[in-house]
From Swiss-Prot:
This is Inheritance of peroxisomes protein 2. The gene is INP2. It comes from Eremothecium gossypii (strain ATCC 10895 / CBS 109.51 / FGSC 9923 / NRRL Y-1056). GO terms for cellular component: peroxisomal membrane. The lineage of its organism: Eukaryota, Fungi, Dikarya, Ascomycota, Saccharomycotina. The keyword Protein biosynthesis does not apply. Required for peroxisome inheritance. Its main location: membrane. Keywords: Glycoprotein, Membrane, Peroxisome, Receptor, Transmembrane, Transmembrane helix. The chain crosses the membrane at residues 195-212. Glycans are attached at N269, N503, N549.
Length: 652
């Protein structure tokens, strides 16, 4: 479908609207200074043409060279070489999807782009290099602009830009034609038919342009959306490669330097890659943040929160990125950009129908954007704003992509000496700190509290109770973990070769000083023990017994079980350090009384049991005196020190 100044009114006979031959006078004067403007803008310059005017039919060009002039270039290589008739057909196909059908197509394009996936956009990157030039072989080097009137508007093209301007507005033309028809009712002249035909042609052009441009806005929105998504895929792929390269240099550079060989990559490569990533992430972040504030007024906030929940957009983290100015590293800036990108795509998914007025506002969105206000706009205005925003984002992405492309030489493989025999040292495994689990649990609990506070609509009693319980649990958790000390169930390593343990006891026992019967190597050391006389006071006996239990000198030869060698908790040690000798003696007396107050067996029976406890080495074969036998778990087996002294004296 091509339109030329003469071809606009030329066509095939036999159609509905036919213009008869009339005089050419008065054809242009009636439109002077009118909204219709110059008749040449419509493609009308011959009023005496007797050829019939065809309505709603394709027109054929009169000039064969016009095929080359009106090749419509677009931003896609697949459209290059497409004539304007094919473009208009596609515009009407896209524009035919009105209302819900257009929104479904719009949302389907976003979802299938995989931009909302966890791993980002994985769609194949397009090989678009830029806007193709206007294919006009007749245009000389001095011609920078090409103007051609069509029934859908004035086509203005240059080497890089192509516009289709709307020249006739429907409402002004309709009002003007109504006034003209009223005056023509009072005029009885032969030229009235020419005027009526011209007015009908003007109304027809206004209707055609109004219909075409309303559909063209939808087509342009879909085209800009596709450009933006493809550009996102390209930029994310480049940024991912730069980020991987930066991580490689961060890991391999210390290993290379330890090998004694100088690195083969330039010294400023690491900082250059970091600067490129910071530049790209900051530039895109602030551009998208500006676009988000504009498009948020078109979205339904309830649907927006719903889509954010579906595609795992953490609103709390986004709130921190939007309202904090702390210094972020390269990885944090990239994560911030990814989160805001997913949020912007959720906004595009939640754009309302063009005939719907949103009356409810989400409390979460109001916390993110306190200045949010929903605006009611007509369909054309909404689409124009949306198309312009998508086009701006696509242009910004193209600029970032060009910058990253210009530094792609920094991504080449750099041979280092990490595989040499001097660099076979493996990195040490990272040791997990003992408090890592405690810190992780605390952060998870705090994150749960933060989510609850962020999504709460009012400060009610339930919310306060929830926060208080969580904080109380955290306080109790930290108090419990700080006072709890790990205790070893195994005996400590003993350096003395004469000290051995045999864990055969399951009841209450005490350390008992026992002599070695048949070991000659231990005989000189046994003479160092000074006998304790029975005439000593009870307090002295108890004090000696206490010292024998708590002494840790290496010169003593104490035979005990593994359970007795368990290290006492620090708080018990601190408690006993604060007590005097008299207080320790009193406490020991209380323990003895408590153990013997319930049952008091006959003296002879108790003495017999105590002697059996002390004579374990004879009953168990003695094992050269190096191993203790089983102890009784009875309370009557508490030793008496003067009997021990008597037994030791007899054996010497």
């Amino acid at each position: 479908m091509y339109y030329t100044p003469k071809g606009l009114l030329s066509g095939r006979p036999g159609q509905t609207m036919v213009r008869e031959s009339e005089s050419a006078t008065g054809g242009e004067g009636i439109y002077a200074g009118s909204p219709l403007g110059n008749a040449l803008d419509w493609g009308i310059d011959v009023y005496t043409d007797r050829s019939p005017t065809v309505v709603n039919d394709d027109f054929e060009p009169l000039d064969s060279t016009m095929d080359e002039l009106f090749l419509f270039p677009t931003c896609r290589d697949s459209y290059s070489g497409t004539p304007m008739g094919e473009l208009i057909r596609r515009v009407f196909e896209h524009g035919a999807l009105g209302g819900e059908h257009f929104l479904e197509e719009f949302q389907y394009t976003i979802i299938t782009s995989k931009g909302l996936n966890v791993n980002g956009m994985t769609a194949p990157v397009s090989s678009v290099t830029g806007i193709s030039e206007l294919n006009n072989q007749n245009a000389g080097p001095g011609k920078t602009m090409v103007h051609a009137p069509t029934k859908y508007g004035r086509l203005v093209g240059s080497r890089k830009v192509l516009y289709l301007r709307k020249t006739v507005s429907f409402l002004p033309v309709a009002l003007f034609c109504v006034r003209c028809f009223r005056r023509l009712l009072l005029v009885r002249s032969k030229s009235r038919k020419n005027i009526i035909v011209a007015l009908l042609v003007a109304i027809y052009l206004a209707l055609q342009q109004e219909n075409f441009h309303s559909r063209y806005v939808r087509h342009a929105t879909m085209m800009n959306l596709g450009k933006m998504l493809n550009s996102w895929s390209d930029v994310e792929a480049r940024m991912h490669r730069y980020h991987i390269r930066l991580k490689e240099l961060t890991i391999y550079r210390p290993i290379t330097l330890t090998g004694g060989k100088p690195p083969t990559y330039p010294t400023n490569n690491h900082s250059l890659l970091a600067d490129l990533l910071n530049m790209a992430s900051d530039m895109l972040y602030y551009k998208i943040k500006h676009i988000v504030t504009e498009l948020l007024s078109l979205a339904d906030t309830e649907n927006l929160v719903h889509y954010c929940g579906i595609y795992d957009v953490n609103m709390v983290t986004l709130y921190g990125y939007l309202h904090t100015t702390s210094d972020l590293g390269t990885a944090d800036k990239i994560n911030r950009l990814q989160l805001l990108k997913k949020f912007s795509l959720c906004i595009l998914l939640s754009i309302t129908r063009f005939d719907r007025i949103v009356t409810t506002r989400s409390a979460v969105v109001l916390k993110l954007f306190p200045n949010y206000k929903h605006r009611y706009m007509k369909e054309t205005e909404k689409l124009l704003l949306l198309s312009k925003a998508l086009g701006d984002v696509a242009d910004c992405l193209n600029e970032v992509s060009k910058v990253l492309e210009s530094y792609k030489s920094q991504l080449k493989y750099i041979e280092t000496s990490i595989n040499d025999q001097h660099n076979n040292v493996l990195p040490q495994p990272v040791m997990i700190e003992s408090g890592l689990e405690r810190v992780t649990v605390t952060l998870n609990e705090l994150n749960e509290i933060q989510n609850k506070l962020f999504h709460a609509e009012s400060d009610d009693e339930t919310l306060r109770k929830f926060v208080q319980e969580k904080l109380h649990e955290l306080c109790h958790f930290w108090e419990h973990t700080t006072t709890k000390k790990p205790t070893s169930l195994l005996p400590p390593q003993v350096t003395s070769p004469h000290r051995q343990f045999h864990n055969t006891s399951n009841g209450f026992v005490l350390n008992v000083v026992k002599a070695i019967e048949t070991n000659p190597a231990m005989a000189p050391q046994l003479t160092s023990y000074e006998p304790v006389t029975p005439a000593g006071s009870e307090s002295c006996l108890e004090q000696d017994f206490l010292e024998s239990n708590f002494s840790t000198e290496s010169g003593e030869h104490i035979y005990s079980t593994a359970d007795e060698e368990t290290v006492a908790p620090q708080y018990l040690v601190d408690r006993f350090d604060k007590l005097s000798h008299e207080e320790l003696r009193l406490r020991l007396d209380e323990q003895f009384k408590r153990l013997t107050v319930d049952t008091k067996p006959p003296k002879q029976h108790s003495k017999k049991d105590r002697l059996e406890v002390l004579n374990m080495n004879v009953r168990d074969g003695s094992n050269n005196g190096y191993e203790s036998g089983p102890f009784y778990s009875k309370e009557e087996s508490i030793p008496v020190l003067y009997e021990l002294n008597q037994l030791l004296s007899n054996r010497r």
